[in-house]
Amino acid sequence: MSTLLNILVRDASRAPMQHRDEVEVSLQSGLEGDYRGTRENRQVTVVVQEAWEAALKDLGKDVPWSARRANLLVDDLNLENTSGQTLHIGDVILRITGETTPCPRMEEACAGLQNALAPEWRAGASCTVIEGGKIKVGDSVRLEKETLVATG
């Protein structure tokens, strides 16, 4: 079973990432306190710990996952080619809208990181909120192939 390991938000572009132990998630604004939450297909971004570690192994570097600037870190999950599937985290349901493409900003964190994140969805997935609620570090995470529509 996959677990939510970490939650990060930022209140503006290029702002420092801020750790949260728990956060409210809504259809209107994504993660409370995160400025990207109003983007229709990219309200929440998710990275898998093992994918992040694979990228770092290729680089031979040790870089904190917060350098990815994604919102959620989960473990024991394969997000590759999961567009349209749903992630269930606690009571929250997210629909995966696509792969998160690693941006040039990754090179600022570590030379070569952008290319190391490119294969196999290592940079993570972008999601939209289907069902809001509260999530907290330690919540179980489940990937399902169902197709759901936002209800709020």
Put a short name on every predicted segment.
Residues 1-152:
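Metal-cofactor-dependent catalytic cores
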